[in-house]
A protein has these predicted regions:
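Generic structural signal for beta-strand residues in well-ordered domains
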Residues: 7, 17, 117-119, 158-160, ...
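Periplasmic OmpA-like peptidoglycan-binding domain that tethers envelope proteins to the cell wall
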Residues: 129-197
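Periplasmic peptidoglycan-binding/anchoring modules of Gram-negative envelope and division proteins
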Residues: 71, 76, 81, 85, ...
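N-terminal targeting leaders that direct proteins to extracytoplasmic destinations
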Residues: 2-81
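Generic anion/oxyanion-binding catalytic loop in active/binding sites
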Residues: 13, 96, 115, 136, ...
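Extracytoplasmic/secreted proteins, especially bacterial periplasmic and envelope-associated proteins
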Residues: 32, 49, 53, 57, ...
Length: 197
């Protein structure tokens, strides 16, 4: 690892768990992350997205029966799907927002990409998603805690400016595999480029 942040993630991992910092999830490259998150005119138009309103819309939605796994999500969620994004599997302890050491290197590589000049002037939403196990209201809160945990690690450990990251939990409201709502692929974290800050 040549980058400062990859070395920091590896050092933290090795010190705390006493093993190599290799990542069982497979390796993300900084270049692939930059390519996925590179800004576009669409991202710039999305910069005025109101994340507080998005949270309120999702909270209202989970109160309504029959909206689980709905084929047509609300417009705000449809807009998120069109933004430059990166989806990663971040491992958490069960029913917890504690990030497992196996994912620290992944977060370090993401931090390297966010420090790259092509992305440095942009703002991002860190979106937490869950599967459909459990109650929707609980999953919404858990996904928010997990998105907050990833954001906090990027800020405190990898020195990403706090104003560049907004954490939003969507619970099970945007399943990646709607045919298998309890599948592990639905438990994920997304990074969305919402344009210049």
């Amino acid at each position: 690892m040549t980058s400062y942040f990859k070395m920091l993630a590896g050092s933290v991992s090795a010190v705390l768990i006493g093993v190599s910092s290799s990542n069982a999830q497979g390796r993300l490259s900084e270049g692939d992350i930059i390519k996925s998150l590179a800004g576009s005119a669409q991202a710039a138009r999305a910069a005025d997205l109101n994340t507080d309103a998005l949270r309120r819309d999702v909270e209202k939605r989970i109160q309504v029966e029959g909206t689980e796994n709905a084929a047509s999500p609300p417009p705000a969620l449809q807009a998120l799907a069109k933004m430059p994004n990166l989806t990663v599997q971040i491992q958490f302890d069960f029913d917890s927002d504690w990030i497992r050491p196996a994912s620290w290197e992944t977060i370090g590589v993401i931090a390297d990409a966010l420090h790259h000049p092509l992305l440095l002037s942009n703002k991002f939403i860190v979106v937490g998603h869950t599967d459909a196990k459990g109650k929707r209201a609980y999953n919404l809160k858990l996904s928010q805690r997990r998105a907050d945990a990833v954001r906090d690690m990027l800020v405190s450990t990898f020195r990403i400016e706090p104003g560049r990251l907004v954490a939003v939990g969507l619970g099970e409201e945007q399943l990646q595999d709607q045919n298998n709502p309890n599948a592990g692929v639905n438990r994920r974290v997304q990074f969305l480029n919402i344009g210049p800050r």
